[in-house]
């Protein structure tokens, strides 16, 4: 009898567990904290699929208690899980990149006496919670619960205060970006607008661009005003101001304020315990007018925070739900859906609700699209698998991305390599737009201007190096079939010639397929032949690809393992000869033959 009761209990438990598991949505299986440690450079912020806006906890500055500080080492993310000093929410951030950028427009809630120095107003925190489209945290110093959610182009934050005086701060002087310069203007007691300069991504000092914002608070403040960090003065000059080298509060100034380290504060006296103040922000990369339009279009004035949060969650369930996973452990499903979640962050929207967007490499000029314009084309990172996934599962979005890429060619004469908000950073190597576009075409995604795309691809594959923005080292590639050591980088420790050539081989192999599909037989044969030039790099002695000197001799001495753990490896970028030797996906059988047959391969 006891055994029967036990079996019945187990059966009921299994039924309940199965019902609970089946009731889970794809968003329930996402853990946004995955990838936020060990230099994963992900973050747990609130964002929608491919959203322009993200609201990210900023915890990488201001305290020696942090394990990682953005200014103390190479650092490229606004958040690290092991850090414990919170200095606000950043609006607009990159995920998974290797260079610091964006992560600015920092909002913060505080209580008690007003202070605007982030080293002083920052706080420890606890009780972090994150799910797709939502993030919350409890701020220890202030007893404030901070929550954030987002729409495609705007954000909503909700701060639950204890009894007393509370403040909302907007810090425009700090952020992850290495650029400085901002402007803020009071529109009304509850609304401000302005702009912040961003850019200088991956050592590209001239690749800068503005982000525009409109910010509103839900409650009329008791007071408000600007702040600015004053320059350090010496001697008699210093006697003229009590704020020498410190943050100065402007309580009687009502026009716009500009500077490298400026901000705005709202104060709320007499808050009841549990009273909430909400902050809404719209952004644009075109204008403050468009930032306001984005905010008004995506958030009704009386839209509850929880309704916006639920809308974001619904969007994620629709996007993640295009793939249904069965079987496997719960942890495996969580890993899968979190990876899919991360795959749907970039490229992201740059066009506003009215279709306007910044033209490619034409600073200050604006275009209009009747669809969506995308940005953050980190194509060296994504050309091999991300866009193939989008083509198969999200063809509607991939189609708009293809149109965005061909639009960039029409606007400045080249397809993107590593494009960031209308600026080409030329980060990494190769001609990675080609395999992305060709793969989509060959899979049947054809609702874009393929003739224009082919024109762009052929241009980068044939233009001499001196005029070639995509392949500046193409001359020896065409003449010799390979790129010799020292041609593009005189310092061999920084030479990546083999990596460059391998990217071109893959691009030309893809281009030959498209040429054949479009009936350009001569081009198809030409680019196919070029794609097989990798064989010149093969060294029977090492059994790997090996860098070549201009005279055709192999680099010697040579260690095919050099490059492990980011050590210097002449000829190779972020990898070793063993890593790169197998990077000929267009001719695997040919590589196996070079190596002595399939068994040895």
Name what the model sees in each region:
Residues 1-10:
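Bacterial N-terminal signal peptides that target proteins for export
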Residues 19-23:
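Sec/Tat signal peptide C-region and signal peptidase I cleavage site
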Residues 24-383, 387, 391-435, 441-502, ...:
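Accessory carbohydrate-recognition regions in carbohydrate-active enzymes
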